[in-house]
Amino acid sequence: VALAGLEEKNITVKHSTFCPGFYKLTDYSRKFNDWKRTGHGRVDTIEAIAQSCDVFFYDLAYKMGIDEIHNSLSYFQFGQKTGLDLPGELGGILPSREWKKINKDEPWYRGETLITGIGQGFMTASPIQLALATGAIANKGNLLTPRVLMHSQSKDGQSYNESQPESRQIPIKNIDNWELIIQAMKQTIYGKLGTAKRLNNKLRYTLAGKTGTAQVFGLDPEEKYIAENIDEKLRDHA
């Protein structure tokens, strides 16, 4: 989403957002909480990715709108099968106004755009889809069809077929935007406030990544979280 925001000029490299620990829409009573309830303070794009600042992405999603988010993420194969050479693959869900109308017979709401911006709400993706998208960022837009089978050979050994993944290039408007996202993902591991800094322990290779905010059931603003009063499957297991 950050990459799409940069490519479509919804934000600039110097853009920053103040995070008080929640995001609120005008004329909308609900607060959209950050995973860090005390807030991150003012963060730029690199810091927002490294620290996984939900408020930054709520705000960016609001600027972009669901139509632009849907179109941008479609390039990365979300909501579609990856072409993995195993049976039973599902495409997941990349929600849109049209998807919700068809599947829920309901209009799209502004709040749903915000949570889609952090990969929550109706959106679903498989681990292989996330790996595919991450690889596309690392390869500067080169999207490779994932393969499990390396090669096949006939019983008599006469024929040999090597599995070749197909590749597709995601349109690039500014390569510097892609470099910035890669640097931000490195800061997730190596930055002092990176959410995956614990992985930075005698690494023998350069690592980049991005953590996610788990989606849990909601509590009313006046309610307190008491694990004993909640079904075990809904409890915080972090």
How would you label these PLM feature ranges?
Residues 3-238:
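Beta-lactam-recognizing serine transpeptidase/beta-lactamase-like catalytic domain environment
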